[in-house]
Each structure stands twice: as structure tokens, then as C-alpha cells.
């Protein structure tokens, strides 16, 4: 029997400048008492905006949790128990990819609604129903498949644009693979990350990633270098986080991500996730003898 077409995505996605300080208006949809996760670096840079974001009459004082360790199953289960013990009714994760994976897993094990606030456009995980778990030594453990996508994703483009340029460029590498991996899944009659068949909407979102990168990627990088917000930067952030997130999850993954995950066991690798995915994509396209290989190589350089 043929598998059904299955799509997934966040309950609501909000993107714009200054939204971290205004997230309370959205969080009140989920509950009134938040278990808020971030690391020390995020606290040092953004604590005022974080606190301002909870100045809403419908919210109680949040429980702030600073965590700097790896996203291991033992750690997230312990934090889930803490969230329940503090009578929190939602989880909020603020930070980069690792912190958002932690927040997703905590919400999963605590069975609570989830809001994620990415502080960089370094990967396409914020919108997904997947949390990547690692061993204590930082090597890849497994994908934790969640029951649902985040209920709310809040992207403050002022914060994301201020992140180190390398992080945004790494996110471009992650998004670059989205279309080609989805295309491979369709060609092989494979399944997507929801266990269903990739449908037309998934391919449209995935192809939009590639088109956006080719149209706006270079200009957005140039603007970010100059510290300038622009329509190209806004489109790139949406591409890296939303389009690629929906595209990879509903379209499926292939060799590019398999290679990237394998590289995590090599301590000398030192690459960010999106950088490793871009390398894996080049290998995938070479093996497929894909006509886009030259264009992809030129873009990566």
C-alpha cells in the first residue's frame, strides 16, 4: 500500500526586528508560566531583551535555566523533571541549534508546549519536530523524533543578523542541500522525516531554498558584513530557518546529512553543521553526476 503524503511545520512562525522583546504577546497563547532555557553567552548578550519579552500581564514570572552542556538524553530528561517540578506549563528555548534541540527534547519529555527563539540562522532545525541528541563527547547519538513541531517560532531578525557571519553562512550550507536531498528522496521513492511520502508542497519549499540562495545569498552576505539589514537579509533568514526547515522535514534527507553526521566523530573536523552538510552535498551531487554541481561549487566558494 502506498504511503500517504505527510507534511509538518510549526504551529505559528513570527519573524521581524525586535520580536524577542515582544514575544510575550505570543507566549500567552501557550500558557502563563515558562521554563526558559538559554546558555551563558545568550544571557550575556540578550538578557534584557529576554526579560522584556516576559513583561506581559498574562504571564507569570518565568523560571530561567542556564545550561552550557551538551544535548544528551540524560540532561534533557533531568531538565524535563525540573520543569514539571516548577509547575511550568510551557518551555521556551532561546539560542543556537544546540540549545533549541535541548528545549525541544525537554518539552517532549515534559509533555509541554514549546516556543523556540533562534539567535542565529545557522541551521534549519528550529521549525522541525526533530531533536539531535549527542553523546557526552560531542559525537552524534541519534535523532529524537518528536510528536509534533514547535508550537511557536519567534525569529528576531535584529538578533539573528548580529550573529557571527560564519553562523549564517553555515545555515546557507544547510539550506543549500534541502532541495537536492528532497529530490533524491522522491527519485528513490523514499520517505520524509514524518514517515510519509514527500508531496508537492515539500518540493516547492525545498526548491524555494535553492532559488533564494542563488538570488539573495551573495547580496545578503555582503549586507551582513557591513552590518546592514536589508530585504535580502530578511529573505535569507526566512530561507535558512523556515523554508529549509519545512523543506527538509517534509521532503526528506539523503547523503549530504548522512556524511555530515558521520563527520561529528572526527575531532579534527571542527566544522559547523551546515558547513559539513555543504561538504556532504558536494559529495552527493558528484555521485549523482548532477548538472548543478558546478553552480553549487561556485556558490560555496
PLM feature spans:
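A short, small-residue-rich loop immediately preceding and capping a beta-strand
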Residues: 83-119
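Solvent-exposed alpha-helices and their adjacent loops that cap or buttress functional pockets
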Residues: 5-7, 28-29, 84-86, 107, ...
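Structural motif
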Residues: 12, 34-35, 89-92, 113-115, ...
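A glycine/threonine-rich phosphate-anchoring loop and its flanking beta-alpha core
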Residues: 11, 108-201
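ATP/NTP phosphate-donor binding region
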Residues: 1-90
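Active-site segments that bind and position negatively charged phosphate/pyrophosphate groups
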Residues: 193-301
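Short glycine/serine/threonine-rich phosphate/pyrophosphate-binding segments
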Residues: 20, 43-47, 73, 98-105, ...
